[in-house]
Regions:
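A glycine-rich phosphate/pyrophosphate-binding beta-strand-loop-alpha-helix module
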Residues: 9-86
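Glycine-rich tight-turn/loop motif centered on a GG-T
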Residues: 3-10, 47-55, 152-165, 417-421, ...
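Amide-donor transfer/coupling interface in amidating biosynthetic enzymes
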Residues: 388-390, 427, 431-432, 464-605
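Intein/HINT protein-splicing elements and their conserved insertion hotspots or analogous self-processing inserts
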Residues: 5-8, 32, 58-59, 75-225, ...
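Solvent-exposed alpha-helices and their adjacent loops that cap or buttress functional pockets
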Residues: 32, 69, 96-100, 122-126, ...
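Proline-centered loop/turn at the N-terminus of a beta-strand
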Residues: 39, 75, 438-440, 563
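Short hydrophobic/aromatic beta-strand micro-patches
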Residues: 232-236
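N-terminal beta1-alpha1 cap of cysteine-dependent amidohydrolase-like domains
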Residues: 278-444, 448-460, 468-476, 551, ...
Length: 605
């Protein structure tokens, strides 16, 4: 996406060109085959009829649609507009108004041949001797008009940055294409809001490593805070010469500069720092933990007012842990081994009922995961069972998928469960399925909540917890670290002790027991199959590592015999390595979550 609305107060056409430029420098982190394949959606907002806003709109549309986009060879096939960005009212006899500046918000889209070629801002600390290189499409102008720095000092003085040359954007695409094909690029971030300093800090946050910026500039303020278009890439120092050659070939050699050194091989991980040098002099140095707390402070204060204040404080305080390695993985099995392969080779594909109800939305990913593991995934809606088009007798495995059945208005999963409990035929059908020793059942997220309401029908489900509103009092959508526990769950066979990241997305995921006696009985049964853990692998009650405040950090559980497994996290959303926003480099096609589905296939033999 791209938007540079504040610039419209200085130069409306420049704000439009910069919005497109920002959208493009964002999307070029992905391996786009050709710039012509990029399509734009334009959202125009203006106070039509007010002052000179109509003239600004005309000139900006002309600059964007009639000049820049044709020069770039891209088009804007879709968009929308809001033409009444002004409100007028009277207060105590005085006429008042509030008018928004002309705004253009650009969304860029492009097909990809392989999403695994997408670069992220995460600095690679395992690579020896790396550096950051700036490709400055502003070509040293460093215009500060409309910048975040100007907003801090309440001034709009100065000249607005601009995309002065469409040919430079085309050249940038060519440079990235060539460098990517030679495997030179390790990390990527665009320069935008906040300027070069913010870009470097965000890359350091993502990589959890120190960065030393070295500015060969007599005007460090402009160099650090101008929001000219540009990108910053991480490359190996050994590739520096080749990258310079490619930049020269693209016509960008004179605006390509080495700007920083990156700490390598985990050096400084315990207390990494950002240091800014200019002409050999240290201008600034601070720990990443202090910078990240500053970066998060405004959000923290808002969160403390809106959400559970204790959770807000715990999340903010977690930034003080300088030893926190962030997301990590430690597995007790080979993630690249396909243990289901021998069973798939037989040609037998057990049928799994991918069960859904009104409001459920996770059935496609779930079917894909089971299909990859060697099952025949069949879409089964509750109405299919109610009207007799399908019966659970046809299946050896049942999976209840995630979503928001009946909008959670009867409690998460409650309405779905009552459809079964209050219908004699359905109740008998589910009870018979759960009692059959040759069946497996899985409930994920909303399906987990639903199956927990059916515990009276499930053998060995005594003392199961219910799932209540998150402690944070908010919907939680994030990657959380979990640890596989020692349980009888058929889905988690031979995974005990493994720690990895998994997707969570729920508003009512807090496992809660009706009494301390139930909690003690549950613990004695070894039915806890998965727990939320911190970065060191220890179960935790602290937010956000425990995203919902679950009792005893319970993320998943099983029946005593292990045939029925429930979990709030979503393994089906991250079963491929490429679905994870971060993963170790030695993971090939599959992620640890895929093992759950392959264990189910192995269980069937």
């Amino acid at each position: 996406m791209g938007e540079r609305t504040p610039l419209a107060l200085l130069d409306a056409p420049a704000s439009g060109r910069m919005a497109i430029g920002e959208a493009l420098t964002n999307i070029l982190c992905a391996d786009v085959e050709s710039l012509g394949e990029v399509k734009l959606s334009a959202n125009w907002m203006v106070a039509a009829g007010y002052d000179t806003e109509d003239d600004k709109l005309y000139k900006t549309v002309e600059a964007v649609a009639m000049t820049l986009c044709p020069q770039l060879g891209i088009c804007i096939p879709v968009g929308k507009d809001s033409m009444s960005m002004r409100t007028v009212w009277e207060q105590e006899g005085e006429a008042l108004s509030n008018t928004a500046p002309l705004s253009l918000v650009i969304s860029a889209f492009a097909p990809l041949q392989d999403i695994r070629g997408t670069l992220t801002p995460e600095l690679k600390t395992t690579a020896d001797d790396t550096q950051l290189v700036l490709v400055d499409l502003g070509r040293g102008k460093n215009r500060l008009g409309g910048s975040a720095l100007g907003q801090v000092f309440r001034t709009l003085d100065g000249t607005a940055p601009d995309l002065d040359s469409a040919s430079d954007m085309l050249a940038l695409f060519s440079l990235l294409k060539a460098a990517r094909s030679e495997g030179i690029l390790l990390a990527y971030h665009d320069r935008a809001d906040g300027g070069l300093l913010t870009t470097a800090v965000e890359m350091a946050f993502a990589g959890r490593c120190g960065v030393t910026l070295d500015l060969a500039s007599a005007a460090p303020i402009e160099a650090l805070f101008s929001e000219e278009l540009g990108i910053v890439v991480q490359i190996r120092r050994a590739d520096s010469g080749r990258f310079t050659e490619l930049a020269n070939e693209a016509g960008l050699g004179d605006c390509t500069h080495t700007i920083a050194a990156v700490e390598a091989n985990d050096a400084g991980r315990e207390n990494p720092r950002l240091t800014v040098l200019s002409c050999g002099e240290t201008l600034y140095s601070a720990s990443l933990s202090s910078l990240q707390r500053t970066w998060a402070e405004t959000s923290y204060h808002m969160q403390k007012l809106r959400d559970n204040s204790d959770c807000a404080q715990e999340e903010y305080d977690s930034l003080l842990d300088t030893k926190n390695p962030g997301l990590n993985a430690a597995l007790s099995f080979d993630v690249n081994e396909d243990i289901a392969a021998p069973y798939i080779a037989t040609g037998v594909r057990p049928k799994v009922a991918v069960l859904r109800e009104q409001g459920v939305n996770g059935q496609i990913e779930m079917a894909a995961a089971f299909d990859r593991a060697g099952f025949e995934a069949i879409d089964v809606h509750m109405t299919d069972l109610l009207q007799g088009r399908r019966s659970l007798e046809e299946f050896s495995t049942l999976v209840a998928c995630g979503g928001f059945s009946y909008g959670d208005v009867l409690g998460a999963g409650g309405g779905w469960a009552k459809t079964i409990l209050f219908n004699d035929a359905l109740r008998a059908q589910f009870e018979a399925f759960f009692a059959n020793p040759n069946t497996l059942s899985l409930g994920v997220c909303n399906g987990c909540q639903m199956l927990s309401h059916l515990s009276e029908l499930i053998p060995g489900a005594n003392n199961w917890p219910s799932f209540q509103r998150n402690r944070s009092e908010q919907f939680e959508g994030r990657l959380s670290l979990v640890r596989i526990e020692n349980s009888n769950s058929a889905f988690m066979h031979d995974m005990q002790g493994s720690r990895f990241a998994i997707a969570v997305a729920h508003g009512e995921g807090r496992a809660s027991f009706a009494s301390s006696a139930d909690a003690e009985a549950f613990a004695a049964s070894n039915s806890a199959a998965m727990r939320y853990v911190d970065a060191s692998g220890e179960k935790t009650m602290r937010y956000p590592a425990n995203p919902n405040g679950a009792s005893d950090a319970i993320a998943g559980l099983s029946s005593v015999d292990g045939r029925v497994t429930l979990m709030m996290p979503h393994p089906e959303r991250v079963f491929r390595a490429s679905q994870n926003s971060w993963h170790p480099e030695d993971w090939k096609e599959d992620a640890p979550s895929m093992r759950l589905f392959r264990n189910a296939r192995r269980w069937h033999g």
